[in-house]
Amino acid sequence: MKIINFIWKTRHDAYKVGKYWRHIPDCKTREACHVCQAEESMDHILTECSATGQKLIWELAETMWDERGLPWVWPSLGLILGNNLADFRSPCNTALTGANQFFTILISEFTYLIWKLRCEWRIEHGGNPDKIPEPEKIRRLWFQTLSRRLKLDCLMTNRSRYGSRAIQTSLVDKTWWIVLQNRSNLPSDWPKGGISGVLVGSGSACPPGRNR
């Protein structure tokens, strides 16, 4: 829900960033990024700035996406705001449901991670260049973010608990199977029985027949 709210507010220009501060007395210094000296717009924060890990976060997402064998689209603000419109297709023009869902997850989850890191750096640390998060921290949070989403999707397959809000086991399988460790040894109903982990930046080849 937090991610949905963030995307909605960003679409409606509801955040106080960049030029919002331009004509407010004593706040003009907030308009510019403390590191890049460019306007601290949402576009700059999510796709351009070097201060709070956005480049590394998107590079890690690209590495994970490579597991699907599909072209990566480097995020722009427009793509981020329309991330739920992903439409990857097979050579036969069949919608790749799992790939589209996974792309949406990568873009939405990591957009929000970038925003959280930015808020921490700007609000808690006053934009201090010495407090820019280290790559090790970013990688750790990246893995935690994706692992948490995977676990949530698996839990959401429980129809007795979530009813009409439950996610189909087949969709979870199509979305996540290709980035799981030891995937060739997993049972067909693995979302209901636990998972073995996530391949972060793995270069392992995809077993045939499951690029969905």
Give the label of every model feature segment:
Residues 1-212:
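Family-specific functional microsites
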